[in-house]
Structures are given as structure tokens and as C-alpha cells.
């Protein structure tokens, strides 16, 4: 009995935990993986749009400025070459000479004319004439290519600005995961919440267990991924995330934690990655938020503090208590041992039912016998007519 009480005591002595594991996914959702020795870098250029969107902001802005500046310089140089080849620069003071571009007297003027042409801000005293067919062709090319550059760069900037990454920053996960009893079964639980009043549509949750394993053939897999069921079969993984929800993984026979006791779990080396996905209500774009829990961040024998209260006509969420937990009596044995103990208890109760029924029947039989004796006494005392008198009548 003392051992059972110690097993359920939340304040029992905890074994030392393993520390120092390198995270696969950071708490803020960043994947702690760097791509090294990539030889086929040309593949990034085959999808230039995605490459530009994935760049850091300072690099994206630098590329944005360079794209426009280089096109202006390129076409400005061509305008200058046309003027130089036609001899327009040698007849600047000749009023009878018809240049390709009026008042284009040097490279700077050609550069400014290129900017005016590509940005369509309107011509000033520099304007193309109809005596320059090569200039007309170049004007058409610059107008078309300038529109393509505008569409490409503005599209990149728009997609980069409207990316739902910042929306994922308002989706929060509890700082710890907990293990405790729920409906008589051991469950691994964590909490998710949405700080915004605009909701995530079609929200779903997934969980992955990441740890190293070795196959029967001796192959070592350093980051083996195993799915943790969070209600896929029952539909509980589809969330209506209006208020914070506690996500539960029942530790059953299909769970990788089925044979893990408290001591074994705390000595294990693993990482639990949780992934929340959904569509942003305002934009319709898919959003994904991630977090992870190491062994040190899994609290055995704890439960989350309630954050939802009913006020006058509405529910209020107190996010100050979002990460808080409290200790509850929880067995230190594994879920398998707990299930076996419950099965033995159920079997004992099952086989004890017939014996209890037999005892009840015997008690009822003894009571009926005592009642019959009292009736006989009453008959003899004259409370009931004797059978002989009835026969005589």
C-alpha cells in the first residue's frame, strides 16, 4: 500500500533527466536544419520567384532596387549607343539635324530618358522622334520588358508581405506538455490557443515523435518520425479554435509511450513536434504554426490550469494562466501496467459478483425461514385458524 501511495504521489523523488538534446524544431517553429554542400545550386534559379520570396528582407529589397536600376542602366546605355551611332552627339548645336531623341546630349540624359520611358512618368523636353526606327523598336521593347519587371517584382513583394508567417506568430502553444489521467487513462496533453479575434478556418493539429532508433538489420536512423494520434480516427484533430484547447494523445497499445513509465520517460531522449495548420480567415491563405517539446518539457503528474471563465454574457480567456499547470495524483507506472492492473481489478470484481449474489440469496432464504416460523407460532396462538378446524367444518 505504501508503494501504491508513493506511485500516486506527485511529490515523489524524480530521477535525473537527460539534458542537452539538440532541437529539431525550435519553440518558435523554426526548423533547426541547414542545407550544406548543395552542388546543384542552379535548381534555385529554375524557381526564381520562390527563391526571391524566401530571401531575407534585406536581400529582397536589395534585389528589388538592383532589378530596376540595372534595367534603367541597360536601356540607358542602349539609348546612348543609338545616339552615338547615329551621330546625334556630334550635331547637338545643329538645328537642322533630326536626332533620335531630342535633347539627349550624353549618357546621363540617356539614363534619365530610360527612367522616363520605363516608369511611364511622362516625357519632358526629351522625346523620341519619328525619324528613328531603331529607337521606336527599342521603345517598344523597353515598355514590354519594363511591364514584366514591374509585374515580377511587385508580385514578389506582395507575396512576401502577405505571407501568413506573422499570423502564425499569434498561434501559441503551451510551454510544457503534461502527462496525467483523463477518464482513467494516461494521456499526453498540450494546449494551443489563438490570440487574434479573427479565427483560423479548417484548423487541424498533428503531432510527431522524433527520436533515434536502430533497425533489426543494424541501420541507425537518427531522426525517426512516428505519428502520435491526437484524434485522427475520431475527428478530434479538427479544431474549432475560438478559445484555448487542450490536445490529448491517449497512451494506448498503439502509442509509442505504451510501455514508458515515469522513470523511463524521463530517461528517454526524444522530441515531440506539434503542427497546427489552417486557413487565415482574412486572406484564405494556408497558415502553419509549429512548436516542440523535449523530455525536460514533459511534466508527469500535471494538469493545465483553466483559463476560461464565464462573465456577464460572454466567455473570457485569461492568457496569463495559459502556460500554468498544477500537480495531480498520477500513477508512475506505464500505461500498459496501469491497463493490466485495471484488467485484474475488473476480473476480480466480475468473479466476486456471483459469490455476492449467493450470499444475498442465502440471506433472503434465512429471512424467509424465520418468517415461516413466526407464522406457525401465530397459528398456534390462535392468530390464524388451525387447519384441523377448517377440515371439520
UniProtKB/Swiss-Prot annotation:
Compositional bias per record (Pro residues), positions renumbered to this chain: 384-393
Keyword Transmembrane helix appears in the UniProt entry: yes
Outcome (variant: residue 392 to E): Does not affect interaction with SNX27
GO terms under biological process: potassium ion import across plasma membrane; regulation of monoatomic ion transmembrane transport; regulation of presynaptic membrane potential
GO cellular component: monoatomic ion channel complex; parallel fiber to Purkinje cell synapse; plasma membrane; presynaptic membrane
Highest taxon in the source lineage: Eukaryota
UniProt short sequence motif PDZ-binding, positions renumbered to this chain: 390-393
Membrane-spanning intervals of the chain: 58-82, 135-156
Name of one Pfam family that matches: IRK
Alphabetized GO MF terms: G-protein activated inward rectifier potassium channel activity; inward rectifier potassium channel activity; PDZ domain binding
Domain notes: The PDZ-binding motif specifically binds the PDZ domain of SNX27: the specificity for SNX27 is provided by the 2 residues located upstream (Glu-388 and Ser-389) of the PDZ-binding motif.
Protein name, per record: G protein-activated inward rectifier potassium channel 3
Classification of source organism: Eukaryota, Metazoa, Chordata, Craniata, Vertebrata
Amino acid at each position: 500500500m505504501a508503494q501504491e501511495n508513493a506511485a500516486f504521489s506527485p511529490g515523489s523523488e524524480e530521477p535525473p533527466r537527460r539534458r542537452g538534446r539538440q532541437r529539431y524544431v525550435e519553440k518558435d517553429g523554426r526548423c533547426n536544419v541547414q542545407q550544406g554542400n548543395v552542388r546543384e545550386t542552379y535548381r534555385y534559379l529554375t524557381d526564381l520567384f520562390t527563391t526571391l520570396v524566401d530571401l531575407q528582407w534585406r536581400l529582397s529589397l536589395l534585389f528589388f532596387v538592383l532589378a530596376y536600376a540595372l534595367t534603367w542602366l541597360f536601356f540607358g546605355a542602349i539609348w546612348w549607343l543609338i545616339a552615338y551611332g547615329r551621330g546625334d552627339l556630334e550635331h547637338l548645336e545643329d538645328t537642322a539635324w533630326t536626332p533620335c531623341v531630342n535633347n539627349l546630349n550624353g549618357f546621363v540624359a540617356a539614363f534619365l530618358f530610360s527612367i522616363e520611358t520605363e516608369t511611364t512618368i511622362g516625357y519632358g523636353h526629351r522625346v523620341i522622334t519619328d525619324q528613328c526606327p531603331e529607337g521606336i523598336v527599342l521603345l517598344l521593347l523597353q515598355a514590354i520588358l519594363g511591364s514584366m519587371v514591374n509585374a515580377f517584382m511587385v508580385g514578389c513583394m506582395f507575396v512576401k508581405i502577405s505571407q501568413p508567417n506573422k499570423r502564425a506568430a499569434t498561434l501559441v502553444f503551451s510551454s510544457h506538455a503534461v502527462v496525467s489521467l483523463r477518464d482513467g487513462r494516461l494521456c499526453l496533453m498540450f494546449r494551443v490557443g489563438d490570440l487574434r479575434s479573427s479565427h483560423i478556418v479548417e484548423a487541424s493539429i498533428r503531432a510527431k515523435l522524433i527520436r533515434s532508433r536502430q533497425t533489426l538489420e543494424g541501420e541507425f536512423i537518427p531522426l525517426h518520425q512516428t505519428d502520435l494520434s491526437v484524434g485522427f480516427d475520431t475527428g478530434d484533430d479538427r479544431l474549432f479554435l475560438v478559445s484555448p484547447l487542450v490536445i490529448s494523445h491517449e497512451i494506448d497499445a498503439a502509442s509509442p509511450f505504451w510501455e514508458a513509465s515515469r522513470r523511463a520517460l524521463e530517461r528517454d531522449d526524444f522530441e515531440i513536434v506539434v503542427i497546427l495548420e489552417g486557413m487565415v480567415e482574412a486572406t484564405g491563405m494556408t497558415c502553419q504554426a509549429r512548436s516542440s517539446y523535449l523530455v525536460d518539457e514533459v511534466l508527469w503528474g500535471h494538469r493545465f490550469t483553466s483559463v476560461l471563465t464565464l462573465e456577464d454574457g460572454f466567455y473570457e480567456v485569461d492568457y496569463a494562466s495559459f502556460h500554468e499547470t498544477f500537480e495531480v495524483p498520477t500513477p508512475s507506472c506505464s500505461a500498459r501496467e496501469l491497463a493490466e492492473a485495471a484488467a485484474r481489478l475488473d476480473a476480480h470484481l466480475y468473479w466476486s459478483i456471483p459469490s455476492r449474489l449467493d450470499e444475498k440469496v442465502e440471506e433472503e432464504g434465512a429471512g424467509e425461514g424465520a418468517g415461516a416460523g413466526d407464522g406457525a407460532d401465530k397459528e398456534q396462538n390462535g392468530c390464524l385458524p388451525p387447519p384441523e378446524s377448517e377440515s371439520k367444518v
